[in-house]
């Protein structure tokens, strides 16, 4: 059991991502994140420098994307470990070059993970992200939008608006794009 949130939309970079950067971010999003013993990584993986970004393992090996063996986990380091959770489900779509959700279920701490990626990878590499990502969770009132402007992250929790259920209102809602709906909600003062 767990809680699932769905996402729609993406973040566009100020310049195209380098292929190596895409490969790294996508490998990072596929790995389980726990504190790792850097010295054991270096001893057990002769190619460890290829399995992190620019040869940097990061604090507690958090940037490492090589093979994940139980022996490299350092549970004693958990206090200083700063990854937001076990799974980061943001990735770079290789076809569009957009940062988006990878469709994995049960993505927790998604805003914190986005901030982690911006602070540790995108910003240091000179990438500025812009765009909107809408979210909707299993609970009726768990929805909103993440707006990113030049790597600054803003979130707007959604407001569930109930309409009388009739064909006219259904048609009006069906004609709104996500952007139009957001603009209309801002105009009406429902969100700011």
What are these regions (language model features)?
Residues 35-37, 46-187:
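Charged interaction segments
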Residues 1-34, 191-192:
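Short, extreme N-terminal segment that most often corresponds to the first beta-strand
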């Amino acid at each position: 059991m767990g809680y699932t949130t769905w996402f729609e939309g993406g973040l566009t970079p100020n310049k195209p991502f380098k292929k190596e950067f895409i490969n790294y971010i996508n490998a990072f999003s596929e790995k389980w994140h726990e504190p790792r013993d850097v010295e054991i990584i270096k001893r057990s993986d002769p190619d460890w420098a290829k399995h992190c970004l620019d040869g940097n393992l990061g604090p507690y090996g958090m940037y490492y994307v090589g093979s994940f063996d139980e022996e490299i986990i350092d549970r004693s380091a958990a206090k200083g470990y700063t990854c937001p959770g076990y799974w980061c489900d943001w990735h770079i779509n290789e076809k569009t070059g957009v940062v988006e959700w990878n469709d994995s279920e049960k993505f927790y701490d998604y805003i914190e993970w986005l901030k982690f990626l911006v602070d540790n990878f995108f910003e240091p590499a000179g990438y500025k992200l812009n765009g909107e990502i809408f979210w909707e969770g299993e609970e009726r009132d768990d929805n909103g939008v993440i707006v990113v402007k030049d790597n600054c992250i803003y979130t707007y929790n959604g407001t569930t608006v109930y309409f009388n259920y009739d064909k006219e209102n259904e048609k009006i809602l069906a004609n709104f794009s996500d952007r139009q709906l957001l603009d209309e909600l801002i105009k009406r003062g429902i969100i700011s």
